[in-house]
Amino acid sequence: EIAQCLVGSEMCIRDRYYLHYFTTETTKYHEALPDILKSYDPVTGLWPESPGYALGTVSMLLDIALMLKSNGIDIIADNPVMQKAALAVFPWIDEQCNLIVFGDSRGGSANFTMFENLLTYYTLTKDEDNIKKIAAALNMGINSGNYNRSKSNWTGLCTYVRSIPQVENIETERMSYSAHHRMITMKNYNGNNKMMALLYGGKKGYHLSANGLAMQLYGFGYALAPDAAGYESYWSADVTYHQSATGSNTIMPGYTEGEIKINAMEPMVDSLSYTNSKELNPYINFADVTAGEKRRMVATIRTSDETGYYLDLFRSNLDNNDYLYHNLGTSLSLYTKSNKELKLTSVEDLGVTYSKGYDYFANPRKISYKDDFMVHWKNDKSPISMCMWMLGAENREIYQVDAPYTTLNKALTPGEVSTPPSFTPTLVVRQNSNAWTKPFIGIFEPVKNNKKSVESVTALHTENNFIGLIVASTNGKKDYLLHSIDNQPHHLKGNLSFSGNFSLIREKEGQIEMLYLGNGSLLKKGNYTIEATNNAYVSIYKNNGTWYYSSDSEVNVVLAGKKIHLSAGYNQEITF
């Protein structure tokens, strides 16, 4: 605010004395721009706090920058981190241009004034690539109803470009990672049904939260599995729930905050980048993260332009574990794998609790159940809902509870569900045994009008260091999902072998059309093989009848019995 006053004074009286104290010299009363910008991460361009704070500061700086640019002073060009900070918002917005929610952030639409200022700046500097990127964001906000340009103030009337260019959809980053925030975002916008997931650790300070090793899942433009942010204020009693791991999708007790370790990630984000620069194929994202005694792998898996699902594989090396999962909706129902509804019994409470946030779980219902089951979160106010399939394990109890509403912002939920005074239908899967050797394994599919594309989820192997399952879809596709944590070869019936972190083999009507190997050295099924000397990231996939491959190193493959040696490369056609 002091900086804005200094620049405003300079503009009024045309005296460069004030401008010097903004652009160059810090005093004991204020910081000049170079010192302000030292708070931004030089790699990501992010401010160290939660999204509302992280992106609000750069917006004010851009207001100043545009005033100065119109007077011949370009502080953006002179301070490259400022441009990086302005563009850092993109991985942290969803397809409706709403900010992601974590820490004490409440979400809501991105700052479109910032985008307008950027569009003016890039128009003045004739930066065509960034003009397209910013114009696409503004059009997205207008089309989603989040932004109305006609309500701009007089400053906008004087400084905004006359009209926003109509541009084709721009390519969206597939993966981003901020080590400071312990936040990974995954996006797959390669179809009409845009997919997005968040995987993140907890952190105290910087307006961040001890939220555990948490996950959020998106569908049709909404965070359907959100992080709770409906607290009244920092000082209200409900902050105990909304700003703790109990309001997140995680496992309790155990890790709530601390360093995380990335075991594997694809598309990869290197240590000198904020987002990925390459990707193995258009269909899969995954990240495998360790935090304390927890380890979680989340994947987004596309099965067509219109369909896809998420995989959540969550381990906890404790003897008692509550898997917490909150989803927007008006109710939830549980079913056996043969689609018979499970009847839960009302109980007084959950018995053992692991934080004060449990006090906010109301109307608990319970069943002891060790087999596979399916859950449908229903929404009486919108056609958008969520389906979940979870593989069974011994020593499990399933609780259904009414958690507090998720947000105060009615625009962030389909049909305004899970906003005051309603609730958030929540699942608690309690495992009264170690969940490292018998992890929680879930498949999630956002659906519209109850039209599921996932037909069945079947276990191949669900214990110890190796997990295998099959996801069959209604379009005739069958995905073999394999995951291990020991880097050893594993062999299953059907001439199926695997060594690595994560892999997927896709068949359609019995014919293999994709092999994906994430941080591994062997993947084989029948007459199809990927083999590497050292762990590699490799994908072989068929598109419109043509085989393509991507690999970060040299590999040997076998396609339909034919041996081929492939050099490192991305999205290259395979010639036989």
Give residue spans per PLM region:
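Single conserved hydrophobic/aromatic residue that forms the stacking wall/gate
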Residues: 1-8, 13
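Structural helix-adjacent loops and short alpha-helical linkers that scaffold large soluble proteins
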Residues: 10, 14-28, 65-83, 122-136, ...
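Long, well-ordered core segments of solenoidal/helical folds
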Residues: 17-45, 81-98
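C-terminal, helix-dominated tail/subdomain
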Residues: 76-151
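Catalytic and substrate-binding regions of extracellular carbohydrate-active enzymes
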Residues: 134-139, 143-352, 434-438, 442, ...
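Polysaccharide-binding surfaces and accessory modules of carbohydrate-active proteins
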Residues: 327-395
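Beta-strand-rich recognition/accessory modules
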Residues: 378-474
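Non-catalytic terminal regions with compositionally biased, polar/charged low complexity
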Residues: 427-438, 445-576
